A protein has these predicted regions:
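Generic N-terminal leader segments that precede the first folded domain
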Residues: 1-2
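Extended, amphipathic alpha-helical scaffolds
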Residues: 275-311
Length: 311
C-alpha cells in the first residue's frame, strides 16, 4: 500500500477497495458530475470520498465514451444489488462487435443513449451470476426488459405460444431469445421439453416433421436413433420417402417450403406422424434433450407458418 493509500485509508477513513469508492473515483476520472439521488445513502459517503481522492491526486481526466459510461453505470447500479462487476470497456467493445450492430433477439439496429427500446443494454446471460466477461450479452432494452428474470423454460413457453397480447416480443423473437440463451447457458438439469411441447402439439408436429424433411442432419439422426426402438424402422423410412417424393413431384401448397403442408395433404404421412408423436410422448424422458436441440434448429419462420387445408 502506498503512503497516499495508507493516509486516505487509515487517517481519512476511505475504503479504497470499496466499490462505492471506486465509482466515485471513476466519476472524477471520466469528468462526470456526482448526483446524490443516484446512490443509496449508505454508499454516498464512500462515493464522495472516492471522488475527492481522485481530485486530491489530480488524476488525469479522460473523455468518457459510451463503453466507459456503460461500465460505470452498471457498477453504480450494483452498489445496491451487490452483484459482482468484473467487466471493462474492452469487454463491451468486443461484445458489441459480435452483434454487427443488430440486436440478436429483435433483429433491429441498436441505438445509443436515445432513451428508446432499441437502445443497447448489457444483460447477464445467467441471472444468478454477476457482470463478468463470460456472462454478458448485448441486447436491446426491449429484449432485456422482456427477458427480465425469465429462465430458459419460460422463454421456450413464450416461443411456442401462438399469440400473447401481453408480450412486447413476437413469437419469432421469443424463439430467437430462447435459442440465443440456450447456446450460452450451462444447463444443470433437463428442460422438460416434451412436457412443454405436449401443450403445443402444433409445434411438436413441426419439430418432428422437420426431422423427416431434413433427415441427414446430425440432430435428425440422433432423433431417429432414439425413436427406432419404439417404432418400426420401415415406418420412418417410408414416411421420409413419401414426404420427399411429394416435394419433388410438386404436390405442395403455395409458399410451403418446409414440408409441413406436404404432410397435411397426405393422409398416409399424417397418420405416420401421429404415430411418431405418440411414441415420443410415451417415452418423453428419453426425448427431452434431443427435442430441445431439434426445436432450436428449426428455421425461425417455421413457427409462423399457417397450415393449408388438405387438398
Amino acid at each position: 500500500m502506498t503512503g497516499f493509500e495508507t493516509f486516505f485509508t487509515t487517517v481519512m477513513g476511505f475504503d479504497m477497495n470499496n466499490l462505492a469508492f471506486e465509482v466515485g473515483f471513476d466519476h472524477y476520472r471520466l469528468d462526470l458530475h456526482l448526483e446524490a439521488d443516484r446512490f443509496e445513502e449508505a454508499d454516498w459517503e464512500q462515493v464522495q470520498f472516492g471522488f475527492q481522492a481522485a481530485k486530491q491526486q489530480d488524476v488525469s481526466k479522460l473523455r468518457c465514451n459510451k463503453f466507459e459510461s456503460k461500465v460505470l453505470s452498471i457498477r453504480s447500479r450494483c452498489l445496491k444489488s451487490g452483484l459482482e462487476v468484473a467487466i471493462t470497456a474492452k469487454d463491451l467493445m468486443a461484445e458489441l462487435e459480435i452483434t454487427n450492430g443488430l440486436c440478436p433477439i429483435t433483429e433491429e439496429p441498436f441505438t445509443f443513449a436515445q432513451q428508446n427500446l432499441t437502445d443497447w443494454s448489457i444483460d447477464r446471460v445467467d441471472n444468478t451470476r454477476g457482470y463478468v466477461p463470460d456472462n454478458i450479452a448485448i441486447v436491446s432494452v426491449k429484449a432485456n426488459k422482456a427477458k427480465g428474470d425469465s429462465d430458459l423454460p419460460h422463454m421456450i413457453e413464450q416461443a411456442v405460444r401462438k399469440h400473447n397480447p401481453n408480450s412486447t416480443l413476437t413469437q419469432k423473437q421469443w424463439f430467437l431469445m430462447g435459442r440465443f440463451y440456450y447456446e450460452r447457458l450451462t444447463l444443470t438439469e433437463t428442460l422438460n421439453m416434451t412436457a412443454i411441447l405436449y401443450h403445443s402439439p402444433e409445434i411438436l408436429f413441426k419439430v418432428i416433421v422437420m426431422q423427416l424433411y431434413y433427415p441427414n442432419t446430425k440432430h435428425s439422426h440422433v432423433f431417429s436413433s432414439i425413436l427406432a426402438p419404439y417404432c418400426p424402422k420401415l415406418l420412418i423410412e417410408r414416411t421420409i420417402k413419401l414426404i420427399l417424393k411429394r416435394y419433388k413431384t410438386g404436390k405442395v401448397a403455395p409458399r410451403s417450403n418446409h414440408g409441413l403442408n406436404l404432410v397435411l395433404n397426405s393422409p398416409k404421412a399424417l397418420d405416420a406422424i401421429f404415430i411418431l408423436m405418440m411414441r415420443v410422448l410415451e417415452h418423453y424422458a428419453e426425448f427431452d434433450e434431443i427435442l430441445t436441440v431439434c426445436f432450436f434448429k428449426l428455421p425461425p419462420d417455421v413457427l409462423d407458418i399457417e397450415y393449408s387445408k388438405p387438398v
